[in-house]
């Protein structure tokens, strides 16, 4: 059984027991969270597609940890001017474990 959920402006295909890194959520570590925006639920041959969401479906997850991704380096360069600007960015994430899918 799997589902497609929306969180942080992105769509994720999830299965029960899977660990997933999503955009930072303001939930404490160890707490449970419900995702109500479920676009698709599939259980073998039984597939439910939402318009735009599946009514009554929800995915429950547990927050495992918070952290930051690896650094992404940005370089802005102007030709012939001896100008180079370097910048780095580390995006925050929340790691979750999918504990249940209900359709």
Swiss-Prot record:
UniProt family annotation: Belongs to the bacterial ribosomal protein bL21 family.
SUPFAM superfamilies: L21p-like
GO BP: translation
A Pfam family reported for this protein in Swiss-Prot or TrEMBL: Ribosomal_L21p
Gene Ontology cellular-component annotations: cytoplasm; ribonucleoprotein complex; ribosome
Protein name: Large ribosomal subunit protein bL21
PANTHER family registered for this protein in UniProt: 50S RIBOSOMAL PROTEIN L21, LARGE RIBOSOMAL SUBUNIT PROTEIN BL21M
UniProtKB keywords: Ribonucleoprotein, Ribosomal protein, RNA-binding, rRNA-binding
Subunit and interaction comment: Part of the 50S ribosomal subunit. Contacts protein L20.
InterPro entries hit by this protein: bL21-like, bL21-like_sf, Ribosomal_bL21, Ribosomal_bL21_CS
Organism: Pseudomonas aeruginosa (strain ATCC 15692 / DSM 22644 / CIP 104116 / JCM 14847 / LMG 12228 / 1C / PRS 101 / PAO1)
Function: This protein binds to 23S rRNA in the presence of protein L20.
Family annotation (NCBIfam families): L21 (TIGR00061)
GO molecular function: rRNA binding; structural constituent of ribosome
HAMAP family given in the database record: Ribosomal_bL21
